[in-house]
């Protein structure tokens, strides 16, 4: 079996550790813990790291297409490796959830998230696993764009780092168990 673990975000230095990049932050954390290095792949428009875990090949992916075109990279990788959407797990930010909250789902709509909209459009399905990480709503007077492209304040950053530990554990549990239903029961909240 092969798994494709995709963290969503925007490429480039100015987006590092912005709220919209929590998916990248999580995939970076997992790969750092596993001592994996990313390779830029221009054909797939993604940074990719891979390893074998429990006898399964696992690809960790950060699309370099910018958020709104993430589906291009995901679709290309699924097609190239002959993977089914059952093998896909996407991690991304959710501004409708409180900072640091996580929600695991086996399917669902885009919920207004442009990266997820792009994936749904390109793979033709909403039936893929996802982990949403709460980044909270914008404060009064702050636009959604400025909010999601902004950095976390000190307290929220500490919360997010703790959340990334929890999501890292959830992803590892899923990769070890192979059972996303069990993972949802254990880690939702």
UniProtKB/Swiss-Prot annotation:
Q: Which reaction does it catalyse?
A: an N-acyl-L-alpha-aminoacyl-tRNA + H2O = an N-acyl-L-amino acid + a tRNA + H(+)
Name the record gives this protein: Peptidyl-tRNA hydrolase
Site feature location: Stabilizes the basic form of H active site to accept a proton: 93
Per its UniProt record, what NCBIfam families does this chain match? pth (TIGR00447)
What keywords appear on the UniProt entry?
Cytoplasm, Hydrolase, RNA-binding, tRNA-binding
Which residues participate directly in catalysis? 20 (proton acceptor)
Where would you say this protein principally sits, based on its record? cytoplasm
Which residues hold tRNA?
A: 15, 66, 68, 114
* Discriminates between blocked and unblocked aminoacyl-tRNA, annotated site positions: 10
Q: Quaternary structure per UniProt?
A: Monomer.
What InterPro entries is this protein classified in?
A: Pept_tRNA_hydro (IPR001328), Pept_tRNA_hydro_CS (IPR018171), Pept_tRNA_hydro_sf (IPR036416)
Per the similarity annotation, which family is this?
Belongs to the PTH family.
Task: Kindly list the GO molecular function terms attached to this UniProt entry.
Answer: peptidyl-tRNA hydrolase activity; tRNA binding
Its annotated compartments are:
Cytoplasm
Q: What is the lineage of its organism?
A: Bacteria, Bacillati, Bacillota, Bacilli, Lactobacillales
**Keyword Methyltransferase (UniProt):** no
Function noted in UniProt: Hydrolyzes ribosome-free peptidyl-tRNAs (with 1 or more amino acids incorporated), which drop off the ribosome during protein synthesis, or as a result of ribosome stalling.
Identify the GO cellular component terms for this protein. cytoplasm
Presence of the UniProt keyword RNA-binding in the record = yes
Checking Pfam families in the record gives: Pept_tRNA_hydro
GO biological process terms, semicolon-separated: protein quality control for misfolded or incompletely synthesized proteins; rescue of stalled ribosome
The enzyme's E.C. designation = 3.1.1.29
């Amino acid at each position: 079996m092969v798994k494709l673990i995709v963290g969503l975000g925007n490429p480039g230095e100015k987006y590092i550790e912005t709220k919209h990049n929590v998916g990248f932050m999580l995939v970076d954390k997992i790969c750092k813990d596993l001592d994996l290095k990313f390779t830029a792949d221009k054909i797939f428009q993604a940074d990719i790291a891979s390893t074998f875990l429990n006898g399964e090949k696992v690809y960790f992916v950060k699309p370099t297409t910018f958020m709104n075109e993430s589906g291009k990279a995901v679709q290309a990788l699924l097609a190239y490796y002959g993977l089914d959407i059952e093998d896909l797990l996407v991690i991304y930010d959710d501004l409708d959830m409180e900072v640091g909250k996580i929600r695991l789902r086996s399917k669902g709509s885009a919920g207004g998230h442009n990266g997820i909209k792009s994936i749904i459009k390109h793979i033709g399905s909403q039936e893929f696993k996802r982990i949403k990480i709460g980044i909270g709503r914008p404060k009064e007077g702050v636009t959604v764009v400025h909010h999601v492209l902004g950095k976390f304040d000190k307290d929220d950053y500490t919360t997010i780092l703790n959340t990334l530990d929890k999501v890292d554990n959830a992803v590892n549990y899923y990769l070890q168990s192979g059972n996303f239903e069990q993972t949802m029961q254990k880690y939702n909240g």
